[in-house]
Amino acid sequence: MLHNVSKCIHSICIRVCIKLHVICSSRFSIRCFAVYETYSLIPNTSDGRQAFLYAFYGKVHALVADAIRKGFRFG
């Protein structure tokens, strides 16, 4: 179950990163992809990755919120 949830959240985060990369300035995409690269280095244990996924999703959410505040449109 956890593996499926992790895959789902991971997939959503990557789609958001790609969207940010396409729509936003490079500053947003660099920050987002740096977080993704960190994720890929974590050993695949349920505790380690579950904790990181929460932090990762939080960072992506913050990037999206920051972009919207600065006038970017998503969708």
Curated annotation (Swiss-Prot):
It comes from the Viruses. This is Protein B7. It comes from Human herpesvirus 6B (strain Z29).
